[in-house]
Amino acid sequence: MRRYLIVDDNRDFAENLAEILRDGGDEVAIAENGQEALALARKTRFDALLTDMRMPLMGGAELVHELRRIDPGAAAMVITAHVADDALEAARREGLLAVLPKPVAVPRILDLLAAARRDGLVAVVEDDSRMSDNLCEALRGRGFAAVTAASVTETERLGPVEPFCALVDLRVPGGADGDALRRLRERFPGLPVIVVTGTHEVPPVPHQGYFTKPFDTAELLSAVERLHRERGQTVVPE
């Protein structure tokens, strides 16, 4: 059984979706705005949040931001008719599993909720935008959300997130090789790291796996899934 939080001021939509989920054996709470949702999140540990973006009192982007402070492990998905909304970009930086443009088919929502992984946030540090996008898409396909950084400086600007692991290219702009990894480790002590490198030399830093470009994405995802299963058990040398 899983617990979901649905936040939408369209009560009929929320009730219909909740009924389908409950029929499948899951627990569902409904809120009509972000403030109501946060009150529920303070009392209950949810596996995933599904929220509209534009609602009275508190919208979806602010809700995701505040939820990360209360329960950073909950997966978060957004439904919106305004995919170019500036506030949506802020929410993306805090690790969304999906952004679903309205109208969205209910089966698509159900599939995403079923796949969503609690404590499933991955930090991706890669300056090649195409590779970063491909990695994030592949991670989402396995139920993982991602936050990204393309430079050493950007690793310092990640939102109030708690990734369970990181995929890190050792050579990104803004510092010497390995600086981005060191900054991540300073911010997230003990964070398991999989190194993605363009050289065939074993990285001279503590890591839980390394992949040389070009690599087999399926093998990389298997390594991420292993770390997710073992989260909380892995002891990482500092």
Swiss-Prot record:
Classification via PROSITE patterns: RESPONSE_REGULATORY
Top-rank taxon: Bacteria
Post-translational modification: Is diphosphorylated by GchK.
Keywords, in A-Z order: Phosphoprotein, Repeat, Two-component regulatory system
InterPro entries per record: Bact_response_regulator (IPR050595), CheY-like_superfamily (IPR011006), Sig_transdc_resp-reg_receiver (IPR001789)
CDD domains: REC (cd00156)
Ranges of residues in domain Response regulatory: 3-117, 121-228
Function: Member of the two-component regulatory system GcHK/Anae109_2439. Is involved in a signal transduction system responding to oxygen availability.
Alphabetized PANTHER family for the sequence: RESPONSE REGULATORY DOMAIN-CONTAINING PROTEIN, STRESS RESPONSE REGULATOR PROTEIN 1
Protein name, per record: Response regulator receiver protein Anae109_2439
Organism of origin: Anaeromyxobacter sp. (strain Fw109-5)
